[in-house]
């Protein structure tokens, strides 16, 4: 059974930082590209970026969060990370990790991030 479990969310002040984690199991993590997406309250799902696998150099692609957010992975532990810096109120959302980069057949339940003073 494929499982993805996000953690690390919470309340943070504007300008602050958070690191989200996504623990995975049930598939060969090293084989897959992995993505982060988010859904702000009452809004549509927004793709943030992805990281390729080792075979493709662990290279990354980002949306408009490039420069503030960094995706990384630990293949030995099967964990995906999202480092978020200089957070803004508009970054408040539920954040999800997903396997692959287009058809998100597998993703987690999400972790809520609230950016507020």
Swiss-Prot record:
Keywords: Adaptive immunity, Immunity, Immunoglobulin
Pfam families: V-set
GO CC entries: extracellular region; immunoglobulin complex
Domain Ig-like, first and last residues per copy: 1-113
Biological process according to GO: immunoglobulin mediated immune response
Gene3D superfamilies for the chain: Immunoglobulins (2.60.40.10)
UniProt entry tagged with the keyword Membrane: no
GO MF term list: antigen binding
SUPFAM superfamilies per the UniProt record, alphabetical: Immunoglobulin (SSF48726)
UniProt cross-references to PANTHER family, sorted A to Z: IMMUNOGLOBULIN HEAVY CHAIN
More info: This alpha chain was isolated from a myeloma protein that contains one light and one heavy chain per molecule, linked by a disulfide bond. In contrast, normal mouse IgA molecules contain two light and two heavy chains and lack a light-heavy chain disulfide bond.
Protein name: Ig heavy chain V region MOPC 47A
Source taxonomy: Eukaryota, Metazoa, Chordata, Craniata, Vertebrata
């Amino acid at each position: 059974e494929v499982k993805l479990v996000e953690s690390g969310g919470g309340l943070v002040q504007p300008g602050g930082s958070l690191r989200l984690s996504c623990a995975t199991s049930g598939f060969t993590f090293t084989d897959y590209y992995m993505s982060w997406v988010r859904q702000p309250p009452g809004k549509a799902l927004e793709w943030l970026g992805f990281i390729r696998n080792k075979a493709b150099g662990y290279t990354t692609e980002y949306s408009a969060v490039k420069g503030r957010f960094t995706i990384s992975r630990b293949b030995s532990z099967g964990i995906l990370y999202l480092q978020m810096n200089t957070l803004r109120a508009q970054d408040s959302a539920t954040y999800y990790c997903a396997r692959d980069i287009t058809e998100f057949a597998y993703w987690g339940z999400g972790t809520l991030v609230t950016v507020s003073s």
